[in-house]
Amino acid sequence: MSAESECPKRMEFGPCGGVRPDGQCEMRRGACIFESAVPWSGIQPAPQPVRAPLVLTDFSCTPFDRNDVAATAAILAPGCDAVLVGEHQNKPDFPPTLMGSLLLDAGVTPWVTLSCRDRNRVVLEQELRGLRSIGVETVLCVTGDGRGYDVRPDVTQTFDLDGPRLVSLAASVGVVAAVPETPTAPPLAARPIRLVEKQRAGASLAVLNHVPSPGMIGEFMEAAIAAGLSIPVIAAVAVFTDNVSAAVLQGLPGLELDETVTEQVLGADDPVAAGIGAAVSEAHALLKIDGVAGINVSGLASASGPHIGAEIKAEVGRRIRAEAS
């Protein structure tokens, strides 16, 4: 097989969520090699019966700072049921097991993202067993974004496994495997089916990436349920209150914001209040969709610093929980 016909992430069960809007690969020139979702061919365990958090809030703090982990967790805790720890290609932090331990000590329930980008299978197994041993129940299993060309070019990218195979590994060691899906990434018709294939691999929960409108999530969920989806789904709400926090979201692979809402928030007399209100309104609409069991409060939220952003996301979470009670 030629290099042009191989996935640079060595994926077997693609396509990943980083496919560009024009169908191009995120890591090299040329189209993604996957024209449709590859059916899962491995063991098909029954999904673990789990309850999705109503509010799952993105967690971001100063890297490698134990004190800031605790401080940020204290801000977020009153407005969420769990926190989602990302793993960004340009922002390394403590190893997953250590981060999970710090967050448990801080009194929050962590969902830890585990990526195949920087770990071979042995290290992935170590992290999964380590997380399970300290009491972290849920791991978001991702293939991982490709590292930017100017981000540590001296470091290799591993990709021993892809997301679905990591899901299978996680389920085999007793970890609750959560998975992402990007409804707006090509090929669009394959995305609901690919989520079902992840369920067959052992996923028990799903987190959907941002889309421009709740109606798009409704269409996605209808197609996914028709294809056999039965696991709880958490839909993302974009939280932004200034140009920088909006731009960060729009710069992520496969992520789109509603242009009208973005203009209304950024042009408001009080962008913070407008951003919070827009996020809560979107969450309310998403929770009415069949199969959506929770909300991922996501985004930088503010360019004024991580603690200000955490306070904004905590307020969004508090309002979502108050309206749902």
Pin down the residues of each PLM region.
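Conserved N-terminal beta1-alpha1 strand-loop-helix module at the mouth
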Residues: 45-82, 93
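Acidic (Asp/Glu)-rich catalytic clusters
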Residues: 49, 73-78, 97-109, 128-136, ...
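Active-site pocket-lining/capping segments in soluble small-molecule metabolic enzymes
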Residues: 61-63, 144, 154-184, 226-282, ...
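Glycine- and other small-residue-rich loops at beta-strand/loop junctions that grip anionic moieties
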Residues: 5, 86-88, 116, 180, ...
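Cysteine-cluster motifs in flexible loop/terminal segments that predominantly coordinate metals
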Residues: 1-45
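Active-site-adjacent beta->alpha loops and helix N-cap segments on the catalytic face
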Residues: 66-67, 89-103, 119-127, 145-169, ...
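Short, acidic/polar
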Residues: 62-76, 96, 121-129, 187-197, ...
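Hydrophobic faces of well-ordered beta-strands that scaffold small-molecule active sites
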Residues: 53-60, 81-85, 110-114, 139-141, ...
